[in-house]
């Protein structure tokens, strides 16, 4: 048990304070914890109380870091977890911060998937979108649900318009129809469209059945 002899606001960050116990610097924490924990000069404090304050301070730092991260750009839970891990926060602290953001709907993989799919469908097929979301940690259940809502006709139309634009560029450089077909087919595959869609569009544009 020690006696708090001084509480000083940090010069470089007025939102944080340095706490001295028995005239020696003991810990620093967020200023709001001083009020929440009832910390004041001349009060007594033991090691367990200090540990609890430091733990809560880590949570506040982690939470604020998480808030800044999602404020810049929306993230999946996995992306945010990875970011916070890189910054050195402990797993238990990260878990609390993530639950806090979920509570206020600032972290929602279902919402993220909807937004991502809507944006990427302008230039990509469902396969590329699917694997990108898998890498971002979106669950299989969410993926199956959201990808099933994609309108195949709209997707095929977008694929055709992309292929048409690419075809007009390629035909100026490639006179060999077979090679042109190959390049166009690979282009569509790289965009995430399925084999049947790619083959149908290539044949339509080149009047030539694609052959691998």
From Swiss-Prot:
| Disulphide-bridged cysteine pairs | none
> Which UniProt key words apply to this protein?
Cytoplasm
Q: What is its main location?
A: cytoplasm
Q: Where in the cell is it found?
A: Cytoplasm
Signal peptide interval: none
Record's keyword annotation contains Disulfide bond: no
One cellular component term from this protein's GO annotations in UniProt: cytoplasm
Q: Which Gene3D superfamilies match?
A: Winged helix-like DNA-binding domain superfamily/Winged helix DNA-binding domain
Q: Which GO terms describe its biological process?
A: regulation of DNA repair
Give a short account of what the protein does.
Answer: Modulates RecA activity.
Q: Report the NCBIfam families cross-referenced here.
A: PRK00117.4-1 (NF001058)
Could you tell me what this protein is called? Regulatory protein RecX
Originating organism: Clostridium perfringens (strain SM101 / Type A)
């Amino acid at each position: 048990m020690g006696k708090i002899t001084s509480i000083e606001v940090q010069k470089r960050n007025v939102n944080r304070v340095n706490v001295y116990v028995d005239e020696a610097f003991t810990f620093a924490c967020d200023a709001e914890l001083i009020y929440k924990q009832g910390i004041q000069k001349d009060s007594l404090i033991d090691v367990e109380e200090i540990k609890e304050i430091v733990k809560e301070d880590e949570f506040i730092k982690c939470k604020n870091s998480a808030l800044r991260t999602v404020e810049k750009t929306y993230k999946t839970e996995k992306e945010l977890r990875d970011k916070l891990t890189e910054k050195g926060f402990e797993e238990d602290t990260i878990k609390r911060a993530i639950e806090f953001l979920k509570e206020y709907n600032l972290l929602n993989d279902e919402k993220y998937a909807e937004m991502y799919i809507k944006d990427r469908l302008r230039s990509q097929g469902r396969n590329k979108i699917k694997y990108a979301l898998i890498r971002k940690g979106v669950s299989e259940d969410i993926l199956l649900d959201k990808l099933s809502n994609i309108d195949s006709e709209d997707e095929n139309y977008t694929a055709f318009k992309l292929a048409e634009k690419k075809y007009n560029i390629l035909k100026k450089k490639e006179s060999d129809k077979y090679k042109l077909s190959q390049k166009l087919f690979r282009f569509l595959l790289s965009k995430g469209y399925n084999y049947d869609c790619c083959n149908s569009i290539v044949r339509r544009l080149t009047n030539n059945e694609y052959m691998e």
